Design a protein with these regions (language model features):
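Hydrophobic, well-structured mid-protein blocks that either form specific transmembrane helices
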Residues: 81-118
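An amphipathic alpha-helix signature
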Residues: 4, 8, 31, 71-75, ...
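Divalent metal-dependent phosphate-bond-processing catalytic cores, especially two-metal-ion Mg2+/Mn2+ enzymes
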Residues: 15-24, 28-41, 54, 103-214
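Basic/polar N-terminal segments that are highly enriched at the extreme N-terminus
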Residues: 1-2, 214
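Alpha-helical phosphate/pyrophosphate-handling elements in metalloenzyme active cores
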Residues: 18-48, 60, 69, 73-81
Length: 214
């Protein structure tokens, strides 16, 4: 089998018991998004595919905040597949730099391939799927839906963002609604804008229902 086929099997096996917002189906959606975006970008498609498939192989949220496990697993797997060091290091850099970590985070590595995979991942945090994933994770962490007296914190450090226990609805303001202005590619920006509008409409409906209207 090809390295791509083996990577798919590896990811499916490792994520078979993952939280629903970060499972194989999330990875598959990101993979499809990445292929769509890559059609309009100058990139190494093999690195885009591998980066998309391996980007959440060990999300730090589910490993006590340890950000080294995912890159380590990816490197070990790609080495077992006899991938070149150039490909391995690039994919590892994508995994290390893809995540949103609060408003003050700057990427330490840049490439067209990272831009594509990052946009693909961010798109899955937007729109209807993004809303579903957000409330699924909030339920997983046993967080309240909304507490009117707890305002969103838009200026969190990386550590504050990672350790936040805020109500689920705050996440829209602390991350999701910020993403459309953080997209890297023209294709990503266009899709993000439509999904952003969907979320704004959802929030308007949510608040109306919270107050007993509509």
């Amino acid at each position: 089998m090809s390295i791509l086929d083996n990577t798919i099997l590896f990811v499916k096996e490792n994520l078979q018991n993952a939280e629903a917002g970060h499972d194989w189906f999330h990875v598959e959606r990101v993979y499809k998004n990445a292929l769509l975006i890559a059609n309009a970008e100058d990139c190494n498609l093999e690195i885009v595919k591998l980066g998309a498939l391996l980007h959440d192989i060990a999300d730090s949220k589910f490993h006590n905040g340890d950000e080294t496990i995912g890159p380590k697993l990816a490197r070990e797997f790609l080495e077992s597949q006899k991938a070149s060091e150039e490909v391995i290091s690039h994919v590892v850099n994508i995994i290390e730099n893809i995540s949103f970590k609060g408003g003050n985070f700057e990427k330490k590595f840049t490439s067209n391939e990272l831009d594509i995979v990052q946009d693909a991942d961010r798109l899955d945090a937007l729109g209807a799927i993004g809303i579903a994933r957000t409330f699924n994770y909030g339920g997983f962490k046993n967080r309240p839906l909304y507490l009117p007296n707890i305002a969103p914190n838009l200026h969190m450090t990386k550590e504050e963002y990672k350790n936040s226990e805020a109500p689920t609805l705050n996440h829209f303001y602390e991350k999701l609604l910020l993403l459309k202005d953080k997209m890297n590619t023209e294709t990503g920006k266009k899709i993000a804008l439509e999904r952003h509008k969907f979320m704004e409409n959802f929030l308007s409906q949510f608040y109306a229902e919270w107050e007993g209207g509509k």
